[in-house]
Amino acid sequence: MRLIKAFLVQLLLLPIFFYKRFISPLTPPSCRFTPSCSSYAIEALRKYGPGKGLLLSIKRILRCHPWGGSGYDPVP
């Protein structure tokens, strides 16, 4: 079971690493939070696994808009 969870985490991290490596450098910084949403997602997935980590990441991304919050928002 732990092997499956670890595999799922790595699978979910792949698009985030792709985004950080190839897409993010081409766009101006736009995340309103510290750490950035992609860094938050990486930390949440590594800390909580695929279930809770993915849920926390999605909730954070949904809060990251011009009328949402801003500032320091660490992974709980």
Curated annotation (Swiss-Prot):
Main location: membrane
Entry GO CC: plasma membrane
Entry keyword Membrane: yes
Membrane topology: Peripheral membrane protein
Subcellular localization: Cell inner membrane
Keywords, alphabetical: Cell inner membrane, Cell membrane, Membrane
SMART domains in UniProt: Haemolytic
PANTHER family for the chain: MEMBRANE PROTEIN INSERTION EFFICIENCY FACTOR-RELATED
Biological role: Could be involved in insertion of integral membrane proteins into the membrane.
Record-stated family: Belongs to the UPF0161 family.
Protein name per its UniProtKB record: Putative membrane protein insertion efficiency factor
Organism: Porphyromonas gingivalis (strain ATCC BAA-308 / W83)
